[in-house]
Amino acid sequence: MTVTEHRPWRGVLVATALPLDDNLRVDHGKYAEHCSWLVENGCDGVVPNGSLGEYQVLTPEERAKVVETAVAAIGGTRVMPGVAAYGSAESRRWAEQARDAGCASVMLLPPNAYRADERSVLAHYEEVAGAGVPVVAYNNPIDTKVDLVPELLAKLHGEGYIRAVKEFSGDVRRAYQLAELAPELDLLIGADDVLLELALAGAKGWVAGYPNALPRSCVELYRAAVGGDLGTAKKLYEQLHPLLRWDSKVEFVQAIKLSMDVVGRHGGRCRPPRVPLLPEQEAVIRAATEKAVAAGLA
């Protein structure tokens, strides 16, 4: 599925890692080149300012420029920025910034400064939807402590606040219940290591991590999975899964950046408080990435 006018969140949208220089400053030139390279290698778009993009440790000026850089590189239709913030008003301002920069959609976590109840979640998404740009919800109950269960997602969609959901709970059973409750709500794969399961359950897109390092093979995996070519999909999934599972680990940013370095891309360091991988972790990721390269998956 390629980018479409009305549902640009479909297909493979890469939650982009952010290149930093030796002084941990954002390297916008390398980031622009990375966005272009991803599209050239078959990805449908990018998601800047997600957790993989280290948005939590960016200044407001840096965060805004990251969006502008992506739009200048590949066009706003292909850019779906994360607009998460502690307050709804701030999230709305980020949605307005994305809209004004030319983005066609945004991705929004629920309130995450505290464990919000259903009424607060509804109010949060209503406020940000008021910016006038389509909103893709992001369900990450592991980190936010707010679970956008299928019944709540159906309410959010029914009110017109969201158009799709990035599902990171890991519970693939929810896909079927969500399809029953809100058949027009697009389900997006939110964790790399449940790609095949959610693709078979009807997912319309993938907000992806490991295409940062291995875009062509990851895109081939996604296309085969959603297209019903299970022979191709299962083989690729088995080959890539030793890496894909790192997307669901605490060290996912460091892991994906290391794999980028191994394949010759600019991964590099992370800003504090993220610390370098332990030697034994680095060895596992490096070996798995080198094995993928040797298998022709890079």
Segments (PLM) and residue ranges:
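C-terminal alpha-helical cap/extension of soluble enzyme domains
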Residues: 2, 8-17, 34-37, 41-43, ...
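Short, flexible micro-motifs
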Residues: 14, 48, 53-56, 85, ...
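Catalytic alpha/beta core domains of metabolic enzymes, predominantly
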Residues: 131, 142-250
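Active-site beta->alpha loop and helix N-cap motifs at the rims of alpha/beta catalytic domains
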Residues: 2-145, 155, 298
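Secondary-structure boundary/capping positions in well-ordered alpha/beta enzyme cores
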Residues: 77-78, 134-135, 163, 185, ...
